């Protein structure tokens, strides 16, 4: 999300509803805290508001709410609906001859929802080359291994069958992601799906590859420990 909001997307926190802004839809709405942190850092609302996550009468609900949170382009949570809305936004842009782009992030477990594939068929049929979808492919969902719940595999072949351009990357490598997004922007024949191979809980040893952390917050002690982790990145030209 940081790469999208700080490098790729045409957005203005001072004018969050600008007609020609790029749109972002977090189809895996349960990952809302990551979106909220990005929006706060970008300046859509004060960072102090992050401390009110999921509190009554505050703007940051458990899932993105476009009516209460500045910068949220679509309310999501019911899996599959976000990518469907993103398709509608992309088609509207085509009809209006607008040059904005639409980005959406899905979870791999979310791909078990049939609505996702209706949306994929729709986007491929209408050649929505202004739409880029990302799949967070870590192989885990709240109930465990995705292949043992309701396997959506093979993912690349499914998107290709609906006339999507498919790019696979290491989801923890910003350079690979940046290059993939630039490739998607240059592709004119239809939508692009960027499959990000990731590790759940990457960087935190006791969380890595553990499905149990899907919907569980760290304890106060664990939160303090996490705050001390420093991840350095080399300076990039973009």
Model-derived regions: residue spans:
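Cofactor-binding active-site loop characterized by glycine-rich and histidine/acidic residues
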Residues: 1-125
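Generic beta-sheet signal
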Residues: 22-24, 100-104, 131, 190-198
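Short secondary-structure boundary/capping segments
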Residues: 42, 149, 208-212
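Thiamine diphosphate
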Residues: 71, 75-78, 83-187
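Short beta-alpha connecting loops at secondary-structure transitions
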Residues: 139-142, 207-216
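SF2 helicase motor core recognition
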Residues: 196-207
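Gly/Ser/Thr-rich active-site loops/lids in small-molecule metabolic enzymes
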Residues: 213-225
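Single conserved hydrophobic/aromatic residue that forms the stacking wall/gate
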Residues: 229-238
């Amino acid at each position: 999300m940081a790469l999208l909001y700080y490098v790729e997307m045409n957005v203005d926190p001072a004018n969050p509803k600008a007609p020609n802004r790029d749109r972002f839809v977090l189809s895996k709405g349960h990952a809302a805290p990551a979106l909220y942190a990005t929006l706060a850092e970008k300046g859509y609302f004060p960072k102090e508001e992050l401390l009110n996550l999921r509190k009554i009468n505050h703007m940051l609900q458990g899932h993105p709410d476009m009516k209460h949170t500045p910068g949220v382009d679509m309310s999501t949570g019911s899996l599959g609906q976000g990518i469907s809305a993103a398709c509608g936004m992309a088609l509207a842009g085509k009809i209006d001859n607008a040059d904005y782009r639409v980005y959406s992030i899905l979870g791999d477990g979310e791909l078990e929802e049939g609505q996702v594939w209706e949306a994929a068929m729709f986007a491929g049929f209408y050649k929505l080359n202004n739409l880029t979808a990302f799949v967070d492919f870590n192989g885990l969902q709240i109930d465990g291994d995705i292949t043992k719940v309701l396997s959506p595999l093979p993912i690349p072949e499914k998107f290709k069958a609906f006339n999507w351009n498919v790019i696979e990357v290491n989801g923890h490598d910003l350079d690979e992601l940046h290059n993939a997004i630039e490739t998607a922007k240059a592709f004119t024949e239809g939508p692009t799906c960027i499959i990000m191979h990731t590790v759940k809980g990457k960087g935190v040893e006791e969380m890595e590859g553990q499905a149990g952390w899907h919907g569980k917050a760290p304890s106060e002690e664990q939160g303090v420990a996490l705050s001390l982790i420093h991840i350095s990145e080399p300076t990039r030209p973009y």
